[in-house]
Amino acid sequence: MARGLAVFFLLAGACLALAEDVVDKGVAKARVESCSGUQLNRYPGAKQFIQEDLPLFHNTKFQHIGGAAPELLLLNKQDQELERFDLKKLSREEINELMIKKGFYKKSSKDEQVPEEYQEGPYMEKEEL
């Protein structure tokens, strides 16, 4: 009985390990989470990025979370979180550079068409800008 139980837990552990490996690790979209009021006002670089630059990036969105400090979440196609970045100490330029380094396309205007290679992820990280 004890041996059968040990085998069961061993197999269950192996299945869980395999399930974790199935997660798609390709960055396909990004979400910035933050409050849109007083908390965000403390971080002018993040506030400017969210208001002026985020709408120009393809496959990105803003999610209001009351009282939350600004964070960038990189997600796969299933909306699973792959990476999280604290934006509090970053300037607007640094956040833009981070997005571009992570492979996201920034349009020069809202009307600009997104090139074919940027339509869908996964996006590849760039070594140099």
Curated annotation (Swiss-Prot):
PROSITE patterns, per the entry: ER_TARGET (PS00014)
Coiled-coil portions: none
GO-annotated cellular components: endoplasmic reticulum lumen
Keywords, in A-Z order: Endoplasmic reticulum, Selenium, Selenocysteine, Signal
Region of interest: Disordered: 107-129
Signal peptide: 1-19
Coarse class of the protein's main subcellular location: endoplasmic reticulum
Renumbered ranges of motif Prevents secretion from ER: 126-129
Source organism, top-level taxon: Eukaryota
GO molecular function terms listed in the Swiss-Prot or TrEMBL record: oxidoreductase activity
Compartment(s): Endoplasmic reticulum
Tissue specificity comment: High expression levels observed in hepatopancreas, testis, ovaries and intestine. Also expressed in heart, stomach, gills, cranial ganglia, muscle and hematocytes.
Active-site residues per Swiss-Prot or TrEMBL entry: C35, U38
Pfam short name (any one): Sep15_SelM
Role: May function as a thiol-disulfide oxidoreductase that participates in disulfide bond formation. Involved in the regulation of reproduction during the period of rapid gonadal development.
Family: Belongs to the selenoprotein M/F family.
Protein's UniProt name: Selenoprotein M
Organism: Eriocheir sinensis (Chinese mitten crab)
